[in-house]
Every structure is written in structure tokens, then in C-alpha cells.
Amino acid sequence: MMRKYLKQLSLTLSLIIAGALAGCGFTPLHSTGGAATSLADIDIALNKGSSVVDNQAGFFVLQRVRDRIGTASDASPYRLEITPRYRRRRLGLTSGDVASRYDITVTANWTLVDAKTGKKLERGSTESTVSFGAPDGPFGVITADNVGVEQTAKETADKLIIDLARYFSSDKAQAVK
């Protein structure tokens, strides 16, 4: 008896939720049409950073964005320009002025451009920070820093994709189309 009641209750709740989602205009990000189609039509350009590590972080951001949204066709209607920035900050200094922890921050300043007209459609900045304990020895710090840059850049790229999806699902993007 109780099972039958729970089954009816779950079916009723499922129908109510489905109706509410259909009524609110909810569109899944990866569905056909909508933001997913627009994300697949973006040509990505990486602007040079001011340092080698900026460029390394930019490379990881670029690779992650391409992995997530794919590579664009030759006639892409949009161009995404990304300018990377890397910062490492020492934390937890010992009495010998040696850091025991580091924070790595990767920032991606981006601009979405209409490829035909050159008009700037949207711009933003995404940032992520990763902390790591400093291993003993200089090579351990270098290795940990390299891994930290890659992890932080991937997280930054994921946030950038969310910002782009938010733009393409907005009324502002629909007015441009």
C-alpha cells in the first residue's frame, strides 16, 4: 500500500516539475539549438601575455575551451579573444623568508567579437585561484607550480564557457542574431 502511494507521489511530482520547467523556458545548455549551437561557432584567438607563464596559462585556457566547445568552422560568426594573466603569491613565510604555501591565480580577460563587423558583443573577465603546499627543494616547487597553473587555467576556462553560455542564452544575444 505504501509503495503504491510513493510511486503515485513520485509520478505526480515528476509531472509537476516537468510542467514547471517547460513553462519557465528552461533550455539545457547542451541541447540542440540555443547556446550550445552558438558556442560551437566560435573561433578562438589567444592574445600574447606579458610573460612566458602568462602564455603558458593562456595555452591551457585555450586548450580547455577547445576541448569543451570544439573547434569552429572556417566561417565562424564569432571570434573570442582571450588575454591571459598569471600571478603567484607566496603565503606562510618561514623565519628564513621561504614560502610554505603558494596561491596561483589565472585570469582570462575575454572579448566576444562579431567576426563580420568587428563589433564587440560582450566582454568579461574570469579568474580562478589554486593553493598548494611548497615541497622541499626548488624542483618540487617548479613541478607543483606547473601543475597548479594547468589546474587553475582549466577552472578559469570552465568559468569562461559558463559566461559565454549565459550571454548566448540572454535576450542581448538574441537581439543581435
Please provide the spans of the model-predicted regions.
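Surface-exposed short loop/turn segments
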Residues: 72-125, 129-147, 154
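Short linear motifs at secondary-structure transitions and domain/linker junctions
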Residues: 17-22, 53-60, 80-89, 102-103, ...
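A structural "domain/chain start" motif
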Residues: 2-63, 69-70, 170-177
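C-terminal/domain-edge helix-coil "capping" segments
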Residues: 136, 140-177
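Short secondary-structure transition/capping segments
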Residues: 6, 11, 30, 119-132, ...
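Sec/Tat-exported extracytoplasmic proteins
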Residues: 68-73, 112, 116, 159-172
